[in-house]
């Protein structure tokens, strides 16, 4: 169940460009509130694992996991709230189906696109998929 009051809920309908969405993702990965919500023990190597929940332009609720840390599929493999810039991140279990090319290129299990991990996916690709979802679903 998506909770619009928890720190993981993001109002993305105001985001208009891929560059703005990349900033939203980087800010989300370094969000202290979200980290405290999901990983109160900051020494945990998995502390930058979050569910990102959002509502689309037409009101559909969607979510996906966005992760980055020294133990996950991201570039660079670092864990730090202060680091803030990742070129590739780990995405998992989106509640909608990504575009065919993204699934074919990045999904670990192409037969189950909403039930798989997308390792080392460029943050710009994630931003494009989020923008498409916000505008069309």
Model-inferred region functions:
Residues 9-11, 20, 28, 61, ...:
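Acidic/proline-rich low-complexity IDRs
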Residues 115-137:
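Active-site or metal-binding loop neighborhoods of secreted/extracellular toxin and effector enzymes
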Residues 26-85:
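Amphipathic, interaction-prone secondary-structure segments
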Residues 7-9, 17-19, 43, 58-59, ...:
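Intrinsic-disorder/low-complexity loop/linker signature
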Residues 70-122:
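Intrinsically disordered, low-complexity regulatory segments enriched in Ser/Thr/Pro
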């Amino acid at each position: 169940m998506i909770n619009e009051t928890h720190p993981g809920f993001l109002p993305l309908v105001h985001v208009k460009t891929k560059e703005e969405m990349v900033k939203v993702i980087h800010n989300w990965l370094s969000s202290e509130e979200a980290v405290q919500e999901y990983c109160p023990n900051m020494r945990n190597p998995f502390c930058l694992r979050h569910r990102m929940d959002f509502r689309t332009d037409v009101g559909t609720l969607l979510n996906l996991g966005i992760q980055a840390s020294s133990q996950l599929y991201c570039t660079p493999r670092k864990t730090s709230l202060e680091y803030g810039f990742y070129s590739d991140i780990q995405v998992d279990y989106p509640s909608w189906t990504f575009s065919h090319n993204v699934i074919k290129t990045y999904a670990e299990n192409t037969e189950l696109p909403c039930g798989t991990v997308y390792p080392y996916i460029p943050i710009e690709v994630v931003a494009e998929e989020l923008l498409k979802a916000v505008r069309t679903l």
